[in-house]
From Swiss-Prot:
The keyword Signal does not apply. Homohexamer. Forms an RuvA(8)-RuvB(12)-Holliday junction (HJ) complex. HJ DNA is sandwiched between 2 RuvA tetramers; dsDNA enters through RuvA and exits via RuvB. An RuvB hexamer assembles on each DNA strand where it exits the tetramer. Each RuvB hexamer is contacted by two RuvA subunits (via domain III) on 2 adjacent RuvB subunits; this complex drives branch migration. In the full resolvosome a probable DNA-RuvA(4)-RuvB(12)-RuvC(2) complex forms which resolves the HJ. Residues 1-181 are annotated as: Large ATPase domain (RuvB-L). Residues 182-252 are annotated as: Small ATPAse domain (RuvB-S). One of its GO terms (molecular function) is ATP binding. Belongs to the RuvB family. This is Holliday junction branch migration complex subunit RuvB. Its EC number is 3.6.4.-. The lineage of its organism: Bacteria, Bacillati, Bacillota, Bacilli, Lactobacillales. It comes from the Bacteria. PANTHER family: HOLLIDAY JUNCTION BRANCH MIGRATION COMPLEX SUBUNIT RUVB (PTHR42848:SF1), PTHR42848. Has 3 domains, the large (RuvB-L) and small ATPase (RuvB-S) domains and the C-terminal head (RuvB-H) domain. The head domain binds DNA, while the ATPase domains jointly bind ATP, ADP or are empty depending on the state of the subunit in the translocation cycle. During a single DNA translocation step the structure of each domain remains the same, but their relative positions change.
Amino acid sequence: MARILDNNVMGNEEFSDRTLRPQYLHEYIGQDKVKEQFAIFIEAAKRRDESLDHVLLFGPPGLGKTTMAFVIANELGVNLKQTSGPAVEKAGDLVAILNELEPGDILFIDEIHRMPMSVEEVLYSAMEDFYIDIMIGAGDTSRSIHLDLPPFTLIGATTRAGMLSNPLRARFGITGHMEYYQEKDLTEIVERTATIFEIKIDHEAARKLACRSRGTPRIANRLLKRVRDYAQIIGDGIITAQITDRALTMLDVDREGLNYIDQKILRTMIEMYQGGPVGLGTLSVNIAEERNTVEEMYEPYLIQKGFLMRTRTGRVATQKAYRHLGYPYQNT
C-alpha cells in the first residue's frame, strides 16, 4: 500500500490534477506566504509592463509547484511552455525551445536539478541578458552565431534545490519555498475535490483524511478516491469519519499518516540498531529500498513530523517514534 502515499504523479492522475488545478492565486489553497509574495511581484511586473523575474520553486513532491507555475502564467496573462530537466538532454533541445518563445512567455522546467550541465550553461546568458550563442559546424569550419531572445520568465521547479549549481541558482530573482500543508488547508482541499467530483463527505471525515495525508495535497486527493471506493462498496457511498478510519486502516495508513514503509524504517532502526545512529546505506539495504527512495520519499516527512533525526553519524529514531510504535524508550 506504500504507493498510495507516493508523492509522484501516477497513471491517469495527470488528467485529475488538471481538473482540480486552481487557475488564479485567490483559488489556490494554502502556501499563504508564497502567495502573498507572488501577488506583489506579479502586480509590480504588470504595472511596469515587464516580464516577471525568473522564479525558483522548491520543496517536496506533491505540494503544488507545477500548479503555482500555471497560476503565475494565468495571473500575468501569458503563455506557458512546459518541459522537464530529464527531457532536455542536449543544448540543442533547449535552444529550440528558447527560440520559440514569444515576448513575456513563461518557460517552466520541472525537475530542473536533473538538467545536464552542458544544457544548464546555455541558460546563463539566456536568463541574464536574453541571448544565446550557438556553435554551427565542426572543427575548422565551426562558427558562433549570436541569437537574441525576447524577454521571458523562467520558472524552475525542484525537490532538491541544493543540487542546483551556484551560477544557476544566482540567476533566479524570486524564490518560493513550498512547505507541507496545514491540516485546515488540506481539509479545505479535500472538501473542494469532493465537490468537484461530486463525492459526499462530511467535515470530520475530510479532517481525518487531511490529518493522514502527509501534508501533501496530491496524497490527500489520492486517498480521497480510495476512501470513496471503500464507501461505495462497504458503505452507502457517503464518506463518514468511521468509513474513513476503516478505509485508511485497510490501506495501512496510520493516524499520523505513516504507511508500512515508514513504520518499517522506524522499526528497523529501533529493533536492530537501538534507535541509531544508523547509516542511510545500511538502512536502505535492511528495508530493501533504494537509497534515493528512502532519502527523498520517506525521510522528509518523518523528519518534519519529528520521528527521525539526521545527525553527522547517521539517522536516529526519536522518542516520539518509540511512543508512536509502542516501544519503551531508554535515553542512552
